[in-house]
Amino acid sequence: MPQLILIRHGQSQWNLENRFTGWWDVDVTEKGAAEAWAAGELMKAKGVAPDTCFTSVQTRAIKTLNLALEAMGRLWLPVTKDWRLNERHYGGLTGLDKAETAAKHGDEQVRIWRRSFDIPPPPLEAGSQWDLSADPRYAGIAIPSTESLKDTIARVLPYYEAAIAPQLAAGRTVLISAHGNSLRALVKHLSGISDADITGLEIPTGQPIVYEINDDLSARERYYLSER
């Protein structure tokens, strides 16, 4: 039976600074790099052996994957990078301190923006310092100005079905290094979690989540590798 391993990137600089990150490209911290390496060591110790890997086009996820693979002695594995595995776009909240935003708009409004299923934050304003339209990695892509979790799912799941599911169907073990909300999209799909419940699911940084996948690509079991 194939396995699907999900790992959220190690702590990023803006995780540390408590800022909304979204699509902005932020590196991992020293702690985040250590989390990624430890995840690779754990997978190696537990006998998890990916055949192929997927990640976003964001540095924190790519670096987490590379560090984990290096710790496993599997840097030679094929890796596919795709923007559809990016974090949710936080729109006009990008770069803002979460506590200051709550003080300005109220805890409840910020909770709605962060944790509602289908209500996106305000859009990113034209000319913002966080505008990514000139970033070459997004050439030819209609960059969103903001996204809800529902919007994120709408790009993640078609990519999963088209690119990742066929690898699992071929019996390959797949490792995905991505982000809190793009991974929520996959967990919601695989575990059949409701719209209301998925918004409360926390995915910790640097902790491999393992899915045992049936032949029909349904999920038989989900668990944290550290608990086995």
From Swiss-Prot:
Binding annotation for substrate: 8-15, 21-22, 60, 87-90, 98, 114-115, 180-181
Pathway the protein takes part in: Carbohydrate degradation; glycolysis; pyruvate from D-glyceraldehyde 3-phosphate: step 3/5
Keywords: Gluconeogenesis, Glycolysis, Isomerase
Enzyme Commission code(s) on record: 5.4.2.11
One GO term of the biological process aspect: gluconeogenesis
Pfam families in UniProt: His_Phos_1
PANTHER family noted in UniProt: PHOSPHOGLYCERATE MUTASE
Name of the protein: 2,3-bisphosphoglycerate-dependent phosphoglycerate mutase
Source organism per UniProt: Sphingopyxis alaskensis (strain DSM 13593 / LMG 18877 / RB2256)
